[in-house]
Amino acid sequence: MNYFKRKWNETRGDQYDSWGKSAWYFETDNNGEVLRQIEAYDNGKVLKYDNQNIDDEFGGLADQNLDLSEFVEFSIEKEEFENKWK
């Protein structure tokens, strides 16, 4: 498994724009398929997606593989991801 955290320095641009900027956490397999995803917003809102909870009214689990070569610099430890997933 691979774990990443990537900050998004823009707001959503939709009716939830007031949530602020966000940090996105991904758990992927070795092909870049996103297995679990967390979106953590400045206002404290946290969205979590996986195969049991694919989407909701706010968004959903990535439906495209990540290009792992583009995410190398955003690697994090499994523990950091798991602590946020709780």
Give, region by region, the residue ranges found by the protein language model.
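Short, extreme N-terminal segment that most often corresponds to the first beta-strand
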Residues: 1-13
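Short, flexible N-terminal segments of the mature chain
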Residues: 13-41
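Acidic, low-complexity, intrinsically disordered interaction modules
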Residues: 37-67
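Short, compact, well-ordered microdomains
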Residues: 56-86
